[in-house]
A protein has these predicted regions:
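Bacterial N-terminal signal peptides that target proteins for export
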Residues: 1-11
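Consensus positions within tandem repeat domains that build extended binding/scaffold surfaces
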Residues: 91-94, 114-117, 137-140, 158-161, ...
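Short, T/G/N/S-enriched strand-turn elements that build extracellular solenoid repeat scaffolds
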Residues: 40-41, 93-94, 127, 160, ...
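Sec-dependent signal peptide cleavage junction
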Residues: 20-31
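Secreted/extracellular small peptides and ectodomain modules produced from precursors
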Residues: 31-33, 109, 119, 159, ...
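Bacterial N-terminal signal peptides
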Residues: 10-19
Length: 236
């Protein structure tokens, strides 16, 4: 009987040890930090959500202006970024190469997204609230998974700002100043509409896209070099 008891105890321990050694299910942890005097951030490890609370302009990444952003420690984990109201501009390189970032929620009064802000966010496919944006910086959304992007109120699009993205269709507003190679290498871009009032189609603007249809208004007086190069499917 004692022998059977010992055998039972051994079996019980054998079953219990893996449970004891197993790492506990990760509890929700919220990491917080500050950057300069006007910005606070938090990261929720359970929801994989980053929240940015900033009054005024966000600072730029150290790659650009020598400032270290603590939230970049979570660049591989973050899937969503929420910007609270009060932010006027998103800093240069602020979320560059957040490779698992899928969606962002922008504040209603955001005006500027600076250079390289979301460049290399290869899974980014959803943006909420971007009607107030006026300027998109150089490479701001290059190499992302964005299929849709409203340019309705945009006044300035800098070089390569949406290059190598997954855009399917685009409409360019009348009063927008457009940099070079803005849609370069958007291999899924099949249709583009340029509103009356646009005067220039910039260098390499639609280079290497899948463009099949484009509407060019009579207001256009200049088409830049290589604007439609490698658009092998372009019909009209």
């Amino acid at each position: 009987m004692a022998k059977q008891g010992r055998i039972f105890a051994v079996i019980f321990l054998a079953l219990l040890i893996p449970v004891l050694l197993k790492a506990p299910e990760s509890e929700a942890k919220v990491y917080r930090g500050k950057c300069k005097s006007n910005l606070a951030w938090s990261y929720d490890s359970k929801t994989k959500t980053m929240v940015i609370d900033c009054k005024g302009d966000m600072p730029d990444d150290k790659q650009f202006y020598g400032l270290d952003m603590g939230w970049k420690e979570y660049y591989l984990q973050t899937k969503k970024v929420v910007f609270k109201e009060g932010i006027k501009s998103i800093g240069a390189g602020a979320f560059e190469k957040f490779q698992n970032l899928e969606s962002i929620v922008l504040p209603r009064k955001l005006c500027i997204i600076k250079n390289w802000a979301f460049s290399g966010c290869i899974k980014l496919n959803k943006i909420k609230e971007f009607r107030s944006i006026r300027t998109i910086g150089v490479n701001a959304f290059s190499n992302t998974a964005l299929r849709k992007f409203s340019l309705k109120n945009i006044r300035r699009m800098k070089n390569n700002c949406l290059s190598s993205s997954k855009l399917v269709e685009i409409s360019i507003p009348a009063n927008c100043k457009i940099g070079s190679f803005v849609f370069w290498d958007c291999k899924k871009l099949k249709k583009a509409t340029i509103e009356r009032g646009v005067k220039n189609i910039s260098d390499g603007m639609f280079c290497a896209t899948a463009l099949k249809n484009i509407t060019i208004p009579g207001s256009v007086t200049k088409i830049g070099e290589d604007a439609f190069s490698y658009c092998q499917n372009l019909k009209k």
